[in-house]
């Protein structure tokens, strides 16, 4: 009846005459659909497609919650989706485990969710650990400013993301990718830059408002820009969620706690 219950974005990459295929955070499924039935059909059909396309690998990472944890990483329930993991294995999939930290995988296996409905900023900070509270307080004392990325400043954004990717040993997107992201998602995306007001910062230092490492101070003084971009982030609205997708910061400015 032309009423789709499952959708899937499939990306391909040619390697030595063969193809690698990847479905990022998918496939996506309607809540009313029978999950195992829909996935069984999808996997059967995708195998036929991949065989015809001379594929050597198909990777997918469904956006399906496995089990809930508290902020310390401890499980809060015994209910999990292991049955579905086993179902996928029976259908030929290989699970790479619940890895932690930076890996060669495109998507992280862990995500942090914060319920902000009917809660003030003061309410939220009560649940934060002491380190996070200190970082926010420290960032607030510096002359930092958040601005949306424009066509003129998107290169600054890209430079920060590239520097972060190199430091963390993972790949980065191209400038054209970020430009397309900004253009196509429009009202549901925020691409932000955090700037340091150089003149105000140096004036504060001279007045003894706070101190800073001499090497960092020299870097700031030698930068010819009045507003220095030091941190960046991408945020996407998704119905009732505001997702922090990814971000970056120049290593030399870590002490300013700009992401906070």
Indicate residue ranges for each PLM-predicted region.
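A conserved beta-strand-loop-helix scaffold within acyl/acetyltransferase catalytic domains
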Residues: 1-17, 65-72, 92-107, 111-255
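Acyl-donor binding region in acyl/amide transferases
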Residues: 18-104, 225, 239-260
